[in-house]
Amino acid sequence: MSVESMVQGMIDALTDALGDAAKHDKGNSAAGTRVRKAMQGAKAAAQNVRAQVQGDKNSR
């Protein structure tokens, strides 16, 4: 998988979380849980991107 597609996947996931973030700001607690879950996924995806970039760098 390319780094570009990995980053695009992160962007798509975070864009999807915007709706829940707005609901959370209006007081919806369940939406806040979904936002936290999306952020945890973004953290994991960012770690994968970092590992991929480092691996690519080391192999060049």
Protein language model annotation of sequence segments:
Residues 1-20:
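N-terminal acidic leader/helix
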Residues 4, 56-59:
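Membrane-interface helix-loop junctions in multi-pass transporters/channels
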Residues 6, 30, 44:
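Residue-level recognition of oxygen-bearing side chains
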Residues 8, 32-37:
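Short, charged, amphipathic alpha-helical segments
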Residues 14, 18-21, 39, 43-46, ...:
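A structural signal for well-ordered alpha-helices, especially hydrophobic packing surfaces
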Residues 25-32, 60:
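Short, surface-exposed loop/turn segments at secondary-structure junctions
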